[in-house]
């Protein structure tokens, strides 16, 4: 009987009752996420400072592009080969765990990309289509004579100079 009485629908003082919603909100210690206030003047200063630095970088790129556009296709091809050789040397240094700057990879790749872009712009001006351009590019790559990059030549010269110094 006791069990029946406790299950009855009449509310008792010891029974579970839920307080009204308004009291739940006021008694809660959690009032959402508190984000640190952002000083608008400092964020505006940061925004004002960034464009001039990026503008300077763009000017450097524009200067480099102007310089690249003055070169002939043969000069561009030579420089592309040299940079690709340097990239190969950087990869070798990385695999041998020697000292190298990781930023040099991106820098060299971007320079090669700029040179190839200038080369392609010239082809477009001449009316060369994509398909013919790829065909010409393949032919150019096949005609390349493999030779060591300038940095490797310098290392070889140092090694021969040291060998001669040891003999003397």
Curated annotation (Swiss-Prot):
Pfam families xrefs:
Ribosomal_L29
* Highest taxon listed in the record's lineage: Eukaryota
Q: Please indicate if the UniProt record lists Ribosomal protein as a keyword.
A: yes
Q: Where is the region Disordered?
A: 1-20
Please give one Gene Ontology molecular function term for this protein. structural constituent of ribosome
What is its biological role? Component of the chloroplast ribosome (chloro-ribosome), a dedicated translation machinery responsible for the synthesis of chloroplast genome-encoded proteins, including proteins of the transcription and translation machinery and components of the photosynthetic apparatus.
According to the record's subunit comment, the protein's assembly and interactions are: Component of the chloroplast large ribosomal subunit (LSU). Mature 70S chloroplast ribosomes of higher plants consist of a small (30S) and a large (50S) subunit. The 30S small subunit contains 1 molecule of ribosomal RNA (16S rRNA) and 24 different proteins. The 50S large subunit contains 3 rRNA molecules (23S, 5S and 4.5S rRNA) and 33 different proteins.
Q: What is this protein called?
A: Large ribosomal subunit protein uL29c
**Organism source for this protein?**
Spinacia oleracea (Spinach)
Protein's gene? RPL29
């Amino acid at each position: 009987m006791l069990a029946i009485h406790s299950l009855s629908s009449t509310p008792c003082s010891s029974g579970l009752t839920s307080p009204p919603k308004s009291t739940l909100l006021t008694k809660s210690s959690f009032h959402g996420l508190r984000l640190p206030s952002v000083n608008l003047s400092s964020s505006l200063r940061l925004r004002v400072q960034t464009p001039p630095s990026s503008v300077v970088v763009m000017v450097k790129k524009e200067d480099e592009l102007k310089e690249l556009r003055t070169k002939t296709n043969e000069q561009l091809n030579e420089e592309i080969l040299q940079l690709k050789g340097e990239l190969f040397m950087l990869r070798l240094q990385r695999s041998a765990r020697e000292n190298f700057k990781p930023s040099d990879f991106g820098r060299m790749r971007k320079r090669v990309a700029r040179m190839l872009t200038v080369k392609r712009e010239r082809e477009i001006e001449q009316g060369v289509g994509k398909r013919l351009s790829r065909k010409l590019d393949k032919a150019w790559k096949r005609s390349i004579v493999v030779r060591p990059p300038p940095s490797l030549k310098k290392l070889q010269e140092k090694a021969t100079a040291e060998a001669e110094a040891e003999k003397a």
